[in-house]
Amino acid sequence: MKNDIKKVRNIGISAHIDSGKTTLTERILFYTKRIHAMHDVKGKDGVGATMDSMELERERGITISSAATFCTWGDHEVNIIDTPGHVDFTIEVERALRVLDGAILVLCAVGGVQSQSITVDAQMKRYKVPCVAFVNKCDRSGANPARVVEQLKTRLGHNALLMQLPIGLEADFQGIVDLISMKAVYFDGAGGELLRTEAVPESLLPEAISRREELIDSVSLFSDSLTEAILEGTEISEVMIMEAVRQGTLERKITPVFIGSAYKNKGIQPLLDAVTRYLPCPADIENSALDLSREEAPVQLTSNTEDPVVALAFKLEDGIYGQLTYIRVYQGILSRGATVVNARDGKKVRIGRLVRMHADQMEDIEAIHAGYIGALFGLECQSGDTFAAQGLNLAMTSMFVPEPVISLAIVPKDKKSMVNMSKALNRFTKEDPTFRTHLDPETSETIIEGMGELHLDIYVERIRREYNAEVTTGNPRVAYRETITQKAAFNYTHRKQTGGSGQYGRVAGYIEPLSDEDFLFENKITGGAIPTQFIPACEKGFRMSMAKGPKMEFPVTGVKVVIDDGAFHAVDSSDMAFQAAARGAFREAYNKAKPVILEPIMKVVVETPNEFQGAVMGLLNQRRGMIVGTQDEGQTCVIEAQTPLAEMFGFSTVIRSATQGKAQFTMEFSAYRQVPQSIAEKITEEVAKRKKSAA
């Protein structure tokens, strides 16, 4: 590592699925001499792209995990995170953006700005990541870079500026015109590695001149010297324009747009120049941490290597070498053998082996300096943990983790599969905070939860392949709850005589609805009607009853229990007896308290082109959705609704066909609400059927 922070670029390559993002990364690695042969994502040679190192990724031709790699271009060091383009893997994109300083937004010259481009762009805005855009696939039929630039302006609100013009398009795409140097650039040689510069073709000269004037006019806002040169009519140097473009990009006020075809090896080297010229180095970006000892007051971090170390673990991987933790150092130096503190649990950790990653190969290093990305071994932690020098109680702002929206049961075929499956689930839940798992107490089935059907499909497939576990999956199910709607009294005696000492306990009091908490227990016993040592047993008995409601066996929520009287026996009373008495008392009062079923209501936000607004609202209304609001955003509109989760299964397929695949939606848990009577009756019937078949 050179350790000159000005020469470091931490970038991500983000895009819509199939925009050619992994192919672009592959070409970058080839031109920067990190690899010596190029392979295509779905190539005939069957090797697959370098960055897609997971077997499943190579087969499906999609990127699932964001592999981190580094390369050098000129005297700059570039760390690249290759991120997935599927909406189901957004946690990977979120994590990558948290640790990047800049990004390349890859767009397809034919498809333009697509639904996932909007999601990725929103994520970049959330983390304030400056970016340059690359319009890929200019060799494809229907390629139209000018239209993509317009869409960047209208659909994403970017001040997009064309930095290049294409020389020919579709099958005739030969090279580019650089609008700053006013030279035509062609890419010769077997892999496009030989650059040839010539004069701008006559036919393109008028357009190139007017586009260059537009460019200079737009970026002059960011440079006084450029504005002066324009006003005084003096010569405008290339350096002046570049500095102005860099300033505008860092402020996120402009997005420079480059064009090319990664597959045809055209336009990659100028894009690499743009990364080093216009995207920020770690010192250009302001990073802050939260001071946990001062009520999370923000603390500005510096890129100074003399300061105490602060680093963020942003990705965990269980590889052939054991657990690998990807880490970005924001301040100070993380050295081998150093002791740091994990802000989440306050535990001290000694740093072992440090490495620098290239897809799934590695090289050992002694230290990671501020601004750099590396990986380390043998560190027990979770994704998103902050490590800081002793005496610093700092945490990097927590990464936004969306709630899972879909769940299904997964059943192993035999004992061996069960052992392997639990190993797999243990690993995946640690690596991916949006993938969760729990045991259904009713059916004893393992339930997995995630961000969408593809997300869970991939994990089920990985359990089968990587862990050799034969598993089957069930249908998705909704997590209903129960609650009470009125106050009801209880006075219950538990008495059991079985030779020797028996069991005896009486509890009296009432239960009532509680709106802001799941459960509250209040002891109003006076005069020792129940001895103090048995009160915790009473509370435990009531708590246990809440796990499974007497009516439908769903978990019970929103109940306050008050005990104000009771009785005990000097010999026969015990913890066990009072737990049993509390359970009986709860059953007795529960049915008198008019119990009802609650269902999870989701906040559903749909982004759709305006022409489909009516159709989308109709779909939501059919699903018992309540439209909360709509927002007009030019060509598209955003519809927000509150919809029961039970009605949302299969919605992605329906909305795709209703909007020609142009709408996208997000869904997150909002609240539990009472189920309408007609639906409650259906649920009751289903539960009765299930109980009957189980019996």
From Swiss-Prot:
Compartments it resides in: Cytoplasm
Q: Which segments cross the bilayer?
A: none
Which GO MF terms does the UniProt record name?
GTP binding; GTPase activity; translation elongation factor activity
**Where primarily located?**
cytoplasm
Q: Which residues form the tr-type G domain?
A: 6-284
**Which residues lie in coiled coils?**
none
Keywords for the protein's UniProt record, in alphabetical order:
Cytoplasm, Elongation factor, GTP-binding, Nucleotide-binding, Protein biosynthesis
**Gene Ontology CC annotation, any one:** cytoplasm
* Sequence positions that bind GTP: 15-22, 82-86, 136-139
Classify the source by domain of life: Bacteria
Quote the PROSITE patterns the UniProt record gives. Answer: G_TR_1, G_TR_2
Annotated InterPro entries: EFG_II (IPR041095), EFG_III (IPR009022), EFG_III/V (IPR035647), EFG_IV (IPR047872), EFG_V (IPR035649), EFG_V-like (IPR000640), EFTu-like_2 (IPR004161), G_TR_CS (IPR031157)
Q: Which family does it belong to?
A: Belongs to the TRAFAC class translation factor GTPase superfamily. Classic translation factor GTPase family. EF-G/EF-2 subfamily.
Q: Mind telling me which HAMAP family this protein's record contains?
A: EF_G_EF_2_B
| Record PANTHER family | ELONGATION FACTOR G, MITOCHONDRIAL
NCBIfam families (alphabetical): EF-G, PRK12740.1-5, small_GTP
What the protein does comes down to:
Catalyzes the GTP-dependent ribosomal translocation step during translation elongation. During this step, the ribosome changes from the pre-translocational (PRE) to the post-translocational (POST) state as the newly formed A-site-bound peptidyl-tRNA and P-site-bound deacylated tRNA move to the P and E sites, respectively. Catalyzes the coordinated movement of the two tRNA molecules, the mRNA and conformational changes in the ribosome.
Report what the protein is called.
Answer: Elongation factor G 1
Q: Which organism is it from?
A: Syntrophus aciditrophicus (strain SB)
